[in-house]
Regions:
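Short glycine/serine/threonine-rich phosphate/pyrophosphate-binding segments
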Residues: 42-47, 119-120, 146-147
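PLP-dependent aspartate aminotransferase-fold enzymes
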Residues: 1-105
Length: 175
């Protein structure tokens, strides 16, 4: 009987990850995918850190440090983002995305798709408004729903995160 060498096992894992990332890109409408974060909440917190690091120079100089989080996000995602934001000096502001006035201190927005109430909101106009204010937009999306819903990448999201089961514990963040 044949026992596979470690390199062949590693190659098989790499191929599985590549196929998984390709499927994630197709579902999210994003050009790149990663598959090594723990859960959606952690991936969302990483998205906040990434968007904070990517602030334009004028936002950095002005001290823009607020991320807007739509109130319909899952509570565990909000809790992890808040915990991770505090040591970085990032403030979390929650509210209704439809009522948000984008002030100069807001550098990014996070949306849930579908939201915690199960509604699949049409965020296109909001994303355009955020981009016009030089804000990045991240979306925490249900990956299975994206087989039927319009992917976040198609309506302009900069980052999409999701909880997926590659091996019962791995998730993905997408840029």
């Amino acid at each position: 009987s044949y026992t596979p060498y470690q390199t062949e096992v590693s190659q098989g894992r790499l191929e599985a990850l590549m196929n998984f990332q390709t499927a994630v890109c197709d579902l999210t409408g994003m050009p790149l995918a990663n598959c090594s974060l723990l859960d959606e909440a952690t991936a969302a917190a990483e998205a906040v850190s990434m968007m904070y690091a990517l602030r334009p120079r004028d936002m950095q100089k002005s001290g823009a440090n607020v991320v807007f989080v739509d109130e319909s996000i899952f509570p565990q995602t909000l809790a992890v983002m808040t915990t991770r934001a505090i040591p970085q000096g990032i403030q979390i502001r929650t509210g209704k995305y439809s009522e948000l006035e984008l002030t100069p201190d807001i550098f990014a927005c996070i949306l849930q798709y579908p939201n915690a109430s199960g509604n699949a909101e049409d965020y296109r106009a909001f994303v355009e408004k955020a981009h016009a204010a030089n804000c990045k937009v991240a979306v925490a999306a249900d990956i299975l729903s994206l087989a039927l819903l319009t992917p976040p990448g198609e309506w302009g999201a900069d980052i999409a995160v999701s909880y997926t089961h590659l091996r019962a514990h791995e998730t993905s963040a997408h840029l």
